[in-house]
C-alpha cells in the first residue's frame, strides 16, 4: 500500500478512494491513512440509458462528489453490461456504502480547500505520513492560497494525514458513485 501511495503522489493524484470489501478492512485502511469521510451512493436510476453529458450534469449538480470523466463512465457502464451478460440477475448498487478516502498530496488538497475557503487563515503541520514523507511539512493557509515551509509556524494545528482529510471535508458530505463493488 505504501508503494501505491508513493507512486500516486508522483502522478499528481490528490486523493485516493476505496470501498473495503470486508468490515475488518476499515481498521486496516485507517492505519494506512484512510478515513470514513465519503459515502458511495447508488447511481441515478436511469444511468444505463444516460449519455455522458446527462450524467455529467447530474454529477456536477452535487455539492461535493468525486467526478467521473467520459472514459471512466464508459468503462463502468461496459463492466456492468458484461456483469449482466454473465449473471442476468446482476443489479446495480441499491444502498449507500460507507467508503474511505486518503489524501495523497497534502499541498494540492490544501490548495483546493483554500480556494473554496478564501476566508480561512490557519497554520497546519502534517506529521506521521510514513507512506509519503513529502506531506510531513508545515502549511500556511491565507487568502485562498497555501504556502509550504520546513520551518515551524506559530499557532500551528498538527494533523495526521487521516485527520487532515477529516479537517478538509468537515463541512461537506463527500460522495462518490458508479463504483464497481
PLM region spans:
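Conserved glycine-rich acetyl-CoA-binding loop
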Residues: 1, 10-11, 26-27
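Conserved acetyl-CoA-binding loop-helix of GNAT-fold acetyltransferases
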Residues: 1-6, 31, 84
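Core nucleotidyl-transferase/polymerase catalytic module
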Residues: 2-4, 23-24, 37, 42
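Conserved GNAT acetyl-CoA-binding A-motif
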Residues: 6-21
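Short, hydrophobic beta-strand segments that form beta-sheet elements in well-ordered domains
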Residues: 17-19, 84, 125
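Alpha-helical scaffold elements adjacent to nucleotide-binding pockets in ATP/GTP-utilizing enzyme cores
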Residues: 24-28, 32-33
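Amide-forming acyltransferase catalytic core, primarily the GNAT-like/NAT-type
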Residues: 33-122
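C-terminal functional modules
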Residues: 92-181
Amino acid at each position: 500500500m505504501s508503494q501505491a501511495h508513493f507512486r500516486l503522489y508522483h502522478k499528481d493524484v490528490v486523493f485516493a478512494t476505496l470501498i473495503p470489501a470486508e468490515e475488518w478492512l476499515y481498521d486496516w485502511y485507517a492505519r494506512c491513512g484512510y478515513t470514513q469521510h465519503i459515502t458511495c451512493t447508488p447511481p441515478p436510476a436511469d444511468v444505463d440509458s444516460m449519455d455522458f453529458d446527462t450524467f455529467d450534469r447530474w454529477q456536477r449538480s452535487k455539492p461535493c462528489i468525486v467526478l467521473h470523466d467520459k472514459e471512466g463512465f464508459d468503462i463502468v457502464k461496459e463492466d456492468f453490461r458484461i456483469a449482466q451478460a454473465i449473471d442476468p440477475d446482476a443489479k446495480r448498487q441499491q444502498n449507500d456504502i460507507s467508503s474511505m478516502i486518503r489524501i495523497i498530496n497534502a499541498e494540492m488538497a490544501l490548495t483546493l480547500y483554500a480556494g473554496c475557503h478564501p476566508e480561512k487563515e490557519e497554520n497546519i503541520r502534517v506529521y506521521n505520513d510514513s507512506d509519503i514523507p513529502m506531506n510531513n511539512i508545515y502549511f500556511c493557509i491565507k487568502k485562498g492560497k497555501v504556502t509550504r515551509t520546513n520551518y515551524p509556524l506559530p499557532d500551528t494545528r498538527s494533523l495526521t494525514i487521516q485527520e487532515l482529510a477529516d479537517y478538509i471535508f468537515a463541512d461537506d458530505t463527500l460522495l462518490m458513485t458508479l463504483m464497481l463493488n
